[in-house]
């Protein structure tokens, strides 16, 4: 925003949570668009909110925002490889994401992007790089930039080959497993973990993530009853005992059973570890 000469204090409208644990309802999004839609150029939201794990309805948001003349983009860092994403059918104008979370490409790996086909040949402001130039004439080094049809035309330079290698293997695994099947297992895994936490760790942990499976992915964000210091102590204990989660300030532990390689036994092992910590 600053790069384009705008002051975020004046040009940015931030949605405020209207539900517990920082969750944002569709009603809140609709209210913001009704109030400000005529002066909003871009609606930019996550597919899944990184801290609390809330998943957003891409198609519903896009449809609503388009009625107000807004361009719509999504940050899918925590959604890609986690939820089935029908980006074209959602109508979103564009989306961006990384591959080092659920898609297992490792830190620093190349990112990904989607641009809806209705913008494929549009003359739009862009950072134009030689790798986005028409492949048939790319090496002629002509004076005019001729973009490749579609999202490839937004590429700047050639991708890092070594970081593509693990991504190629991972994407092949996802292709063979199938996102529909992975989502079905994910619903069962995270649902099982939720049930274990609620039935065996009541009074120790509280769940921040929406309880509706349609409003979340694999991730469960949890807080430890008793405050931040106890939460951090539990997180460190889990890490020391080989259970890898993630800590997000001020007081959230993120646990994400990944259906490609996590088992139901892993969910049970997490709960048993928390029990051991709570009673030691």
For each predicted feature, which ranges?
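Pyridoxal 5′-phosphate
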Residues: 1-280
